[in-house]
Design a protein with these regions (language model features):
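Cysteine-centered iron-sulfur cluster-binding motifs in ferredoxin-type domains/subunits
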Residues: 52-62
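Short, basic/glycine-rich phosphate-binding loops at helix/coil junctions
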Residues: 162-168
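Conserved Radical SAM active-site core
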Residues: 23, 32-44, 48, 63, ...
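A broadly conserved sequence feature marking short terminus-proximal activation segments
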Residues: 2-38
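Surface-exposed cleft-lining segments at the edges of enzyme active sites
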Residues: 110-114, 168-177
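Conserved C-terminal portion of the radical SAM core fold
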Residues: 181-190
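Short, conserved loop/turn and helix-capping segments at secondary-structure boundaries
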Residues: 80, 176-180
């Protein structure tokens, strides 16, 4: 039987030990659940108007990923427990841009699909944006667990994109991600 260590903290600081490579490895295997301070959303041009901060970090270890530079000091994966507050803030942005459509990117700081079986945050986002008139949601992933998303009523307000590469690139540079065949099977399901 495998034991997963759980640590409860009052502080928001996550302290990783060792040299930089050790901290990176440890961080990639650390899941943090926290509350996101509701402040201004970051711009996400050109793919969307705003980032939708549901998750940060990624369990993948793609050697070329910009998250390695953006989140080098915080390589851990962080799930935000206050998604309803985040959606409410998104609604404020939608209202402020009416009558224009407002697009939110769910994967600017993470690959949230990898965590969907545990969080259901993408399901919540898809259902939320399905109810908005002028809000749209999009995300990209290398991961393949879309089963919980397939039957959702999305009202064509969500766009799911999958990142593809040949197996040689996936094996050499996209560590801890599904192979091409699984990604292609996922595209067929979508």
């Amino acid at each position: 039987e495998k034991s997963i260590p759980i640590h409860y903290q009052k502080t928001t600081r996550i302290i990783l030990k060792g040299d930089a490579p050790a901290k990176y490895q440890q961080g990639k295997n650390t899941l943090v659940i926290g509350v996101r301070k509701i402040s201004e959303f970051q711009s996400c041009k050109p793919s969307a108007h705003y980032q939708l901060p549901l998750v940060s970090g990624c369990m993948g270890m793609c050697e070329y990923c910009y998250l390695n530079t953006q989140m080098a000091k915080r390589p851990y994966i962080k799930i935000y427990a206050n998604s309803e507050e985040i959606f409410s803030k998104a609604d404020e942005y939608i209202k402020s841009r009416l009558p224009e459509i407002t697009i939110f990117e769910g994967s600017a700081t993470s690959d949230p699909l990898a965590l969907e079986p545990y969080t259901h945050v993408l399901e919540d986002a898809i259902l939320h944006f399905a109810k908005t008139k002028q809000g749209r949601f999009r995300f990209v992933s290398k991961y393949t667990d879309v089963n919980s998303l397939l039957t959702l009523e999305h009202n064509n307000h969500t766009e799911i994109r999958l990142s593809l590469n040949i197996d040689a690139v996936i094996n050499a540079y996209e560590h801890r991600t599904p192979p091409l065949a699984k990604r292609l099977d996922t595209l067929k399901q979508l």
